[in-house]
């Protein structure tokens, strides 16, 4: 099971999952017809009307999951999803949705997998994006709120220098799982010792310089800057959203988005699109407020030329 607008990779089985706005990434490869369910993403600001809409989408998505489970009770190995969809449009979800999925996974004996390749390693202001789903005042070992939404498996990559998965105790219900049986999963181009040593140094520097906290603090500043930018360009910018430095906004059309990217390049800035008409921000963890200010100045100039 997976969500519409997801992105889980461009090799092997993941191409049966990826639902990219760019069809070239998977169109020429054979794929399994695995079930894809409604993506109940939040439209910001989360006012009463938008909340009603997202609750309706959540019910639709959960019902689609339940319907497939009822028709194929023994065929579902897992459900995989991104805590925040990246390439699909920087789509955010409510914790209540993940909690329902966790309950279904326990009731129907399938694993819940969070793909944190893009959202992991601090950029959202927490080490892993799914940690935002805990109650604000939860303790580290909370078993009431946090464990009711935690995944069974997490995938990681990109900033970690090598890709992989780690898993919780529920995997031990499976005899001879991949952490017990050698070579069940293998890779010619997988991680190597140099990658792992380099990432170890990165982790040490992140802890030493408190970069996850910095991403949280400067992320709030970036989001406030984007909200201010929207206020000055209310006819163009909508749906400002973000956690930590993982921020985005929407433009009226794909053409507006592509033109803005081109304008930003002319100003000397590299910026990425996502979804069909969104702009996403992915600063480095130690970005400074002064650099964010510079980016906003460039963005205002680029917007004025649309």
Locate each region found by the language model.
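Conserved N-terminal phosphate-binding loop of PLP-dependent enzymes in the Aspartate aminotransferase
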Residues: 1-306
């Amino acid at each position: 099971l997976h969500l519409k607008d997801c992105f889980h990779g461009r090799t092997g089985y993941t191409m049966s999952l990826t639902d990219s706005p760019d069809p070239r990434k998977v169109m020429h490869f054979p794929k399994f017809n695995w079930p894809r369910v409604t993506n109940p993403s939040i439209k910001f600001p989360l006012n009463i009307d938008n909340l009603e809409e997202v609750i309706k989408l959540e019910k639709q998505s959960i019902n689609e999951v339940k319907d497939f489970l009822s028709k194929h009770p023994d065929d579902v190995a897992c459900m995989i999803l991104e805590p925040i969809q990246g390439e699909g449009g920087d789509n955010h979800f409510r914790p209540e949705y993940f909690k329902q999925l966790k309950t279904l996974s326990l009731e129907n004996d399938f694993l819940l997998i969070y793909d944190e390749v893009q959202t992991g390693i601090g950029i959202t202001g927490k080490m892993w994006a799914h940690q935002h789903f805990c109650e604000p005042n939860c303790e580290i070992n909370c078993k009431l709120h946090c464990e009711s939404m935690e995944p069974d498996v997490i995938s990681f990559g990109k900033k970690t220098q090598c890709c992989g998965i780690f898993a919780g105790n529920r995997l031990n219900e499976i005899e001879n799982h991949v952490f017990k049986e050698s070579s069940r999963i293998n890779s010619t181009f997988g991680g190597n010792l140099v990658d792992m040593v380099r990432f170890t140094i990165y982790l040490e520097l992140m802890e030493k310089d408190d970069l996850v906290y910095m991403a949280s603090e400067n992320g709030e500043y970036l989001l406030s800057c984007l909200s201010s930018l929207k206020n000055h360009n209310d006819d163009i910018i909508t749906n400002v959203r973000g956690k930590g430095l993982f921020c985005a906004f929407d433009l009226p059309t794909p053409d507006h988005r592509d033109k803005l990217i081109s304008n930003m390049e002319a100003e000397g800035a590299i910026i990425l699109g996502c979804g069909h008409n969104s702009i996403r921000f992915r600063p480095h963890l130690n970005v400074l407020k002064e650099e964010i200010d510079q980016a906003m100045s460039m963005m205002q100039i680029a917007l004025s030329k649309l």
